[in-house]
């Protein structure tokens, strides 16, 4: 085995894995979107050259119904989905939006617009859209003693 990826690993989990592994993970797939942004985890992954892959970048569709996100998307003349995807990309993560139609998949690729720093900082501070798809607390490596 030469390459591994992990899913839903928190900082403690990754620290212990990195301390004990021979093969470092190249990707950590986590829930990451406006309203649920674990910046310490994203920063830890960046510092350790672990790519963050964001599943559900539009909050399982909840973000599409949020008036504040809709209004901010209008400012950039994009859909709320595009704004959400762009937000994740500007954090340095890869976005994996779910889409059931070819039209939406094509639309989701067109996210080449700049989001200003002030808007991005406001979005980082939002703490809603949680509790609907959380993976919960399930220690993988974090609570175990290091070898």
Where does each model-flagged region fall?
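Beta/alpha (TIM)-barrel catalytic core signal, keyed to glycine-rich beta->alpha loops juxtaposed to Asp/Glu
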Residues: 1-147
């Amino acid at each position: 085995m030469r390459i591994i990826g992990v899913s839903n690993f928190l900082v403690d989990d990754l620290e212990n894995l990195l301390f004990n592994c021979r093969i470092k993970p190249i990707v950590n797939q986590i829930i990451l979107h406006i309203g649920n942004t674990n910046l310490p985890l994203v920063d830890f992954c960046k510092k350790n050259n672990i790519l963050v892959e964001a599943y559900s970048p539009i909050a399982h569709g909840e973000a599409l119904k949020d008036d504040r996100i809709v209004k901010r998307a209008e400012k950039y003349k994009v859909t709320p989905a595009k704004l959400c995807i762009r937000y994740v990309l500007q954090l340095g993560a890869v976005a994996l939006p779910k889409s059931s139609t070819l039209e939406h998949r094509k639309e989701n690729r067109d996210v080449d617009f700049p989001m200003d720093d002030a808007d991005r900082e406001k979005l980082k501070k939002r703490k809603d859209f949680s509790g609907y798809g959380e993976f919960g607390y399930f220690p993988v490596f974090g609570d175990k003693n290091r070898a």
